Structure formats: C-alpha cells, structure tokens
C-alpha cells in the first residue's frame, strides 16, 4: 500500500482533502480507492461555480468495473477543476494524491475540516476494512 501523505484529511468514503495556503480545499480520491476501482476510463467533473455540500456527490469516476460518486469533504463553491482528467482519467491511477486531484473548493466553513479523518485514522480504517 502506498504512503498516505501527512498533510491530507479524509472521508470514510475514501476522498481526500488538502488544505491549501489560500484556505481553499483540493479534493481527490485516495490511492486505496483508485486501487479498488481499477483502471479509470472517465471522470465527470463538477462545474466551476457549482455549489457542493459536505457528503454529497460532486463528481463521478468511472472504471471498467464500476462508476463511483466522489463526495465533497466540505461545503462551498467549486473554483477549479482538473480538466486534464477529461483526456487522461488514468492520471488518478498513477498519482492519486498529486496530479490526480479532481476539484478545488472555496470552503464555506473551515470548522468542517475538523470532522474529517487525519491520516492515522484513515490508515486504521483501511486496516479494519482488510480484516
């Protein structure tokens, strides 16, 4: 299993959130999630300007096996999307925590970040899933 970056927060549904220096939140799916899905063939991105709600579907990733909603870890407004994923969805498979980010949110309430799992708690969740 790959290393879980220490600067990320997670949802139990395997999305990650990186708090940027400008207060925005970058969102993607975990390396564990992309591994379960297999080779990704399509990503449905949210629109810039869309309002997303914590825990609601904001994007969709599709593999040869299944389509899966990507839930937003925070509420706010989408300010940027990774349009490169339209042509290269496999970027998520190759670099889930880096170039494979999906969208960026201007967060409504920073307190929501306190409800997310830290990397150690997320690693524990993955271990529990395997047993």
Curated annotation (Swiss-Prot):
InterPro entries: 2-oxoA_DH_lipoyl-BS (IPR003016), Biotin_lipoyl (IPR000089), GCV_H (IPR002930), GCV_H/Fam206 (IPR033753), GCV_H_sub (IPR017453), Single_hybrid_motif (IPR011053). Keywords: Lipoyl. GO terms for biological process: glycine decarboxylation via glycine cleavage system. One of its GO terms (cellular component) is cytosol. Residues 24-106 form the Lipoyl-binding domain. Binds 1 lipoyl cofactor covalently. Gene3D superfamilies: 2.40.50.100. Its cofactor is (R)-lipoate. SUPFAM superfamilies: Single hybrid motif (SSF51230). The modification N6-lipoyllysine is found at residue 65. Pfam families: GCV_H. The glycine cleavage system is composed of four proteins: P, T, L and H. The glycine cleavage system catalyzes the degradation of glycine. The H protein shuttles the methylamine group of glycine from the P protein to the T protein. PANTHER family: GLYCINE CLEAVAGE SYSTEM H PROTEIN, GLYCINE CLEAVAGE SYSTEM H PROTEIN-RELATED. Belongs to the GcvH family. NCBIfam families: gcvH (TIGR00527), PRK01202.1 (NF002270). This is Glycine cleavage system H protein.
